[in-house]
Structure formats: structure tokens, C-alpha cells
Amino acid sequence: MKEKNTFGILIVLSSSLCFAIVPSSAKISLDFGSSLFILLFSRCLIGLVLLLPFLFFQKESVYIKKNYVLPVVFSSIVSVSLIAAVYHAIEYINIALGMTIVYAFPIGIALITSIRGEEKYSLREWLSILTVIFGLFILVYDEMFTGSLYGIVICIISLILMTTFVYTSSKLADSLGSIVLNFHLNLWSLIFLFISYVLFSFTLKIPDNSIGLTSLFFNGLFYILSYTLFFWGSRFIGVTRTSVLSLTDPIFATVIAMIFLNQFLSIIESLGFIVVLVSIYFFERSKITKKP
């Protein structure tokens, strides 16, 4: 049990490390001329292509039972809508504020699993979750207060979509497996994006140099790695613990920025950094000590 628990934690932390690269690679690709539609479409297409060899070598069937089709389609639509909503929101508000709102999704996951009787949480665990969110708030405090009410509303919608996507998809991953689930999520997302293009004629523009194209590829690569590892890890340690541990995403992003971009933290940001790490530690310690 202890080995399984440790393995699950390592998988989720690996997922967070991968996801920390996604926003930067997306921004570089967009800065070098990629349209948003191409970014989203290539992300799903790259994920689909990369998962095929794993399905082949593991001899996994891509076919799923009829009773799973509608839930998978629903999760795919929610996934694409989530990404579109987040990118739309940050056109109106600071990205730090937007991501802080969206990263509150573990509270939603904890509420759902608690109400449905799937998990029970102690007061210390609730306080740990809330303190993690507060730590993220401190971490991005200096950059937060710019934007509009409209952007905040869109971010709240994104938060609801994120909570819905993570909860429904984690349940599907328990039944279908992470690789099969992510294959279908990307497949149906591509279909949904294609239909959207036919209806609305979105701009198609690829990056205009090798740096942009490379960033486009890495965006798709680390996106599919992060979600595949996320749902794989949730099968070992549960969706709530996975969600809370995924809040290390901005921590990894901060460390990457410090190493490669020489962007160091202020005193307030450092305090937020420490609060997040300590809160996650106490949440995990509480979960582990509760296990028989």
C-alpha cells in the first residue's frame, strides 16, 4: 500500500512538472504567429498520434462500451470549452488572477466527493486545501489586480468547467484507463474543433519560424503527458489528493522561470511559495496517517 501511495504521488508530481511547461510553450507559439485554433487543434492531434503506439504495444483496444460514449463526449466538450474559456478570460484580466481562480478547483472536487459520500475530510484537510489556495494568491499577489469583472466571470465559469472535467474524467479513467480515456478525449475534441471551424471559420495560422513550430510541438507533447499522468495517478491516490498535488504546477513553473529565465521571487512571492509547499505537506501527511 505504501509503495502504491508513493508511486501515485510521484506520477502526479511528474504530471505537474509537465503541465508547468504547457503555458510557456503555448505563449511562445502564439507570440511567433500561431493562431489559437491551430494551437488547440495541434495539441489534440499531437496527443492522439503520441498515444497510438502506447495503445498498440499495450494491446489496448480503442473501442469503448456504448455506455461510456456519451460521458466521454461530454468530458471532451468540457475540456475544449475549458481551454477556450481560460484563453478568452486572460484577454480581459491578468493571467495570474485567472489561473489563481481556476486553480481553486480542488475545493470543488472536495465538495463533490464529500457531498456524494465518496471521501471524508478532517478539518485539518479542509484547512490545508484552503491554505494552498491562499498561498497561490500570495504567490501571484503582485500581478493580480488588473482586469475586468467580465474576465473574472469567465474565469469562474472556467473554474466550474475545470472541476467538472477533472471529476468526470477521473471516474472514466478508473474504468477505461488513462491512455484509452485520453485517446478518446483528444479524438472527440478534434471532431468538436473541426465542427466549430466549419461553423465559425476560425483563423488558421501556423508559427512563422522553427522556434514557434518547436514550441507548438512541445505544447502538445507536455499537454498529453500531463493529463495522461494526472488521471493515471488519480487511480492510485484518488481524485482529491491528485487535484491538491496538481497545485504544484505553479511551483514548478516558478522554479523553471528561476532556472532558465532568471526570474526570482520577491519576499511576498517567496512567502506564498512556502505556504503552498507547507500546506500540501500537511494535507498529504494527514491523508497518509489516516490510512490503515
Ranges and model annotations:
Residues 98-104, 169-191, 223-259:
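Helix-helix packing/entry segments at the starts of transmembrane helices
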Residues 18, 23, 52-96, 102, ...:
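Specific transmembrane alpha-helical segments of multi-pass solute transporters/efflux pumps
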Residues 1-38, 42, 77, 85, ...:
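Glycine-/small-residue-enriched transmembrane alpha-helix faces in small-molecule transporters
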Residues 12, 25-27, 51, 109-110, ...:
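Transmembrane alpha-helical segments that form core, pore/gating elements
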Residues 51, 121-141, 193, 268-287:
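Hydrophobic transmembrane alpha-helices of multi-pass small-molecule transport proteins
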Residues 7-15, 42, 61-85, 150-158, ...:
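Loop-to-transmembrane-helix transition segments
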Residues 50, 55, 86, 105-127, ...:
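C-terminal transmembrane-helix exit sites in multi-pass transporters
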